[in-house]
């Protein structure tokens, strides 16, 4: 159990730091649409699509790697709670267009990139 806890702990810390860096690097470009949160969620959507295929098709991988990547790193990187407060802040300020745009970009972008990640990994690991 301890190796699983360490895998999640380290992965989550690294994912959260990357999310913070994305915010520092991108949020100032369009203050009404925090691009750091969007980038974190889109990158996480793509990466989890790849990870889902890899960890399903590669049964020999230690379970701690799945915990490190999906539960830890991608759990720390992606952020539904920050996304939610950004949407609600716009809505409560009467900025319904921005609230809708943020919501739609996160949801459609994440689903699209998750599918793209699954397609990418399936192409990489397809039997010859």
Swiss-Prot record:
<feature type="binding site">
    <location>
        <position position="75"/>
    </location>
    <ligand>
        <name>Na(+)</name>
    </ligand>
</feature>
<keyword id="KW-0813">Transport</keyword>
<feature type="transmembrane region" description="Helical">
    <location>
        <begin position="5"/>
        <end position="25"/>
    </location>
</feature>
<keyword id="KW-0406">Ion transport</keyword>
<comment type="similarity">
    <text>Belongs to the fluoride channel Fluc/FEX (TC 1.A.43) family.</text>
</comment>
<keyword id="KW-0407">Ion channel</keyword>
<feature type="transmembrane region" description="Helical">
    <location>
        <begin position="67"/>
        <end position="87"/>
    </location>
</feature>
<feature type="transmembrane region" description="Helical">
    <location>
        <begin position="96"/>
        <end position="116"/>
    </location>
</feature>
<feature type="binding site">
    <location>
        <position position="78"/>
    </location>
    <ligand>
        <name>Na(+)</name>
    </ligand>
</feature>
<keyword id="KW-0997">Cell inner membrane</keyword>
<feature type="transmembrane region" description="Helical">
    <location>
        <begin position="35"/>
        <end position="55"/>
    </location>
</feature>
<comment type="function">
    <text>Fluoride-specific ion channel. Important for reducing fluoride concentration in the cell, thus reducing its toxicity.</text>
</comment>
<keyword id="KW-0479">Metal-binding</keyword>
<dbReference type="GO" id="GO:0140114">
    <property type="term" value="P:cellular detoxification of fluoride"/>
</dbReference>
<protein>
    <recommendedName>
        <fullName>Fluoride-specific ion channel FluC</fullName>
    </recommendedName>
</protein>
<dbReference type="InterPro" id="IPR003691">
    <property type="entry name" value="FluC"/>
</dbReference>
<keyword id="KW-0472">Membrane</keyword>
<keyword id="KW-1003">Cell membrane</keyword>
<keyword id="KW-0812">Transmembrane</keyword>
<keyword id="KW-0915">Sodium</keyword>
<dbReference type="Pfam" id="PF02537">
    <property type="entry name" value="CRCB"/>
</dbReference>
<dbReference type="GO" id="GO:0005886">
    <property type="term" value="C:plasma membrane"/>
</dbReference>
<dbReference type="GO" id="GO:0046872">
    <property type="term" value="F:metal ion binding"/>
</dbReference>
<keyword id="KW-1133">Transmembrane helix</keyword>
<dbReference type="GO" id="GO:0062054">
    <property type="term" value="F:fluoride channel activity"/>
</dbReference>
């Amino acid at each position: 159990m301890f190796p699983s806890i360490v895998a999640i702990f380290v992965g989550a810390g690294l994912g959260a730091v990357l999310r913070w860096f994305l915010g520092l690097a991108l949020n100032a470009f369009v203050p009404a649409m925090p691009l750091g949160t969007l980038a974190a969620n889109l990158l996480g959507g793509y990466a989890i699509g790849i990870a889902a295929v890899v960890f399903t098709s590669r049964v020999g991988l230690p379970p701690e790697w799945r915990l490190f990547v999906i539960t830890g790193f991608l759990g720390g990187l992606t952020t539904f709670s920050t996304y939610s407060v950004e949407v609600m802040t716009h809505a409560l300020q009467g900025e319904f267009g921005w609230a809708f745009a943020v919501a739609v970009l996160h949801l459609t972008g994440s689903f699209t990139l998750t599918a793209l990640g699954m397609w990418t990994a399936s192409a990489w690991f397809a039997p010859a």
